């Protein structure tokens, strides 16, 4: 299973592609889509959408995992982040992919085992889990963490479905 993780942002959108083969997580690619803050906001959203559509076309993931909005005191920033998330979600939906959303707490819990882990702990764990030569750029590392979260969540979901089936056949 190939997963595209996305850390949306109105200026920088991180992406990370991983492959899950059995119990192994394999790094495929990561990077960031940069938008030109001199351009109007709709053009920046288009840049995010087109950049992610190109990544989807290149790597053909089976699923897209997007980090959910964090709480923000700045309403304008929260709205722009929400719109960037929308562009990311639409890229996945138009490609016909299932899109999953995870909170920062869920991502940290899945990667480090602690929902209140520091960003540096998450980055270091991603480096170790994916056998990276160095810590990825911050936004890309966050996106890889979202992808790892989904990989771990899909394993748990599959286990729960199997347990549910076993429970029904034993009843």
UniProtKB/Swiss-Prot annotation:
EC number: 3.1.21.10
Descriptive protein name: Crossover junction endodeoxyribonuclease RuvC
GO terms under biological process: DNA recombination; DNA repair
Catalytic residues in the record: 7, 67, 139
Catalytic activity: Endonucleolytic cleavage at a junction such as a reciprocal single-stranded crossover between two homologous DNA duplexes (Holliday junction)
A GO cellular component annotation in the UniProt record: cytoplasm
Keywords: Cytoplasm, DNA damage, DNA recombination, DNA repair, DNA-binding, Endonuclease, Hydrolase, Magnesium, Metal-binding, Nuclease
Positions that bind Mg(2+) 2: 67
PROSITE patterns referenced in this protein's UniProt entry, alphabetically: RUVC
InterPro entries according to UniProt: RNaseH-like_sf (IPR012337), RNaseH_sf (IPR036397), X-over_junc_endoDNase_Mg_BS (IPR020563), X-over_junc_endoDNase_RuvC (IPR002176)
Family: Belongs to the RuvC family.
Gene3D superfamilies the UniProt entry points to: Ribonuclease H-like superfamily/Ribonuclease H
Main location per the UniProt record: cytoplasm
Designated gene of the protein: ruvC
NCBIfam families xrefs: PRK00039.2-1 (NF000711), ruvC (TIGR00228)
Cofactor(s) required, per the database record: Mg(2+)
Class of enzymatic activity (EC top level): hydrolase
Biological role: The RuvA-RuvB-RuvC complex processes Holliday junction (HJ) DNA during genetic recombination and DNA repair. Endonuclease that resolves HJ intermediates. Cleaves cruciform DNA by making single-stranded nicks across the HJ at symmetrical positions within the homologous arms, yielding a 5'-phosphate and a 3'-hydroxyl group; requires a central core of homology in the junction. The consensus cleavage sequence is 5'-(A/T)TT(C/G)-3'. Cleavage occurs on the 3'-side of the TT dinucleotide at the point of strand exchange.
Cofactor note: Binds 2 Mg(2+) ion per subunit.
Compartment list: Cytoplasm
Subunit text: Homodimer which binds Holliday junction (HJ) DNA. The HJ becomes 2-fold symmetrical on binding to RuvC with unstacked arms; it has a different conformation from HJ DNA in complex with RuvA. In the full resolvosome a probable DNA-RuvA(4)-RuvB(12)-RuvC(2) complex forms which resolves the HJ.
Pfam short name (any one): RuvC
Keyword Chloroplast (UniProt): no
Residues reported in the UniProt entry to bind Mg(2+) 1: 7, 139
Any one GO MF annotation of this record: magnesium ion binding
């Amino acid at each position: 299973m190939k997963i595209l993780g996305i850390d949306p942002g109105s200026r920088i959108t991180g992406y990370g592609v991983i492959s899950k083969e059995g119990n192994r997580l394999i790094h495929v690619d990561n990077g960031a889509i940069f938008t030109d803050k001199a351009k109007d906001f709709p053009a920046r959203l288009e840049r995010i959408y087109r950049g992610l559509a190109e990544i989807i076309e290149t790597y053909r993931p089976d699923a897209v995992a997007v980090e959910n909005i964090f709480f923000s005191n700045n309403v304008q920033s929260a709205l722009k982040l929400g719109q960037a998330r929308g562009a990311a979600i639409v890229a996945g939906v138009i490609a016909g992919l299932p899109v999953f959303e995870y909170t920062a707490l869920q991502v940290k819990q899945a990667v480090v085992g602690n929902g209140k882990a520091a960003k540096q702990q998450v980055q270091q764990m991603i480096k170790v889990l994916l056998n990276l030569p160095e810590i990825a750029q911050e936004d890309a590392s966050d996106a890889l963490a979202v992808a790892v979260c989904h990989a771990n969540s899909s394993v748990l979901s599959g286990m729960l479905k199997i347990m549910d089936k076993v429970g029904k056949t034993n009843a």
